[in-house]
Amino acid sequence: MEYQLTLNWPDFLERHWQKRPVVLKRGFNNFIDPISPDELAGLAMESEVDSRLVSHQDGKWQVSHGPFESYDHLGETNWSLLVQAVNHWHEPTAALMRPFRELPDWRIDDLMISFSVPGGGVGPHLDQYDVFIIQGTGRRRWRVGEKLQMKQHCPHPDLLQVDPFEAIIDEELEPGDILYIPPGFPHEGYALENAMNYSVGFRAPNTRELISGFADYVLQRELGGNYYSDPDVPPRAHPADVLPQEMDKLREMMLELINQPEHFKQWFGEFISQSRHELDIAPPEPPYQPDEIYDALKQGEVLVRLGGLRVLRIGDDVYANGEKIDSPHRPALDALASNIALTAENFGDALEDPSFLAMLSALVNSGYWFFEG
């Protein structure tokens, strides 16, 4: 299924992206759920899938994490089942992500899907990332507050909430409606009837993640082996003093690594092309030979990217799942980065090069791309 998003992107980016929340009524016309509640519940029984149940009764909140064996103990009100990265495990839901590729691929994270019974929700809370919440089957009431300094608390060790807030948006969403919320705006949603919601979340690494990730890269490649030296050690009034110029020199030693463009690009390509959630990688058995890949494409078969696989381009380099893809065939690499589905036409003359076919075969045999059907 192909989903068509009714949205004036230039206007949205200017007025709302990372600025103000907004309800997009009938963002998807005639919306059809790509997954059923039963299918979602089945996914939450799998150990590889990240899921949780959130419920509340008389002001007391409970959170449990999957995989779940049964749902028989749940009542008819006040609970929600939330499943992360469903687009990694259920191919039809991945189609919901594609209309949002007007925004950079490296900023898009995953598709979280929730099923809620009446009264179900996770309470008032803040997110530090952008999210588009699509209303599927059923109705849900959403409240969004102003972006202010808010006190957070934990009614349960696995649940972070904020205090009650005054709403600037208070709307009942129906199938196909979309609520966009930028980072830092408090919000809460409660199902009015059995309801499905689809949250397209965005990735925003913080400084701590960046420094930690770059440090791992430096250690793995044994970079930064230069030692501090001071042949002209300056005098000081007290031997315990560390002088400002020494602090500057130490800072410069660290910045020198980050300021190497090729290393910084290589690190960030590997870092940001890795998914935060497990992928449904299933290498083909037996593995494909390069000539089999060639024949299949020439016969019109379509090569499809694995759901959730992050394929990104930085300059002339393309990265997939933390690996740099090397090939002199730039148009073919661009096709891998730009297209979800690929045909022989996308690869052009590159298919006649045995080295490119060997590289493509390795990607397919890693489970990153597969033949449709």
Model-identified regions with their sequence ranges:
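Short polybasic amphipathic segments
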Residues: 51-55, 142, 315-321, 371
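C-terminal amphipathic alpha-helical segment
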Residues: 220-292
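Long, charge-rich, low-complexity alpha-helical segments
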Residues: 12, 19, 324-373
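Active-site region of the double-stranded beta-helix
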Residues: 1-16, 28-177, 185-228, 232
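Acidic, low-complexity/disordered tracts enriched in E/D and polar residues
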Residues: 259-337, 361, 373
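Short coil/turn segments at secondary-structure boundaries
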Residues: 55-56, 265-270, 347-348
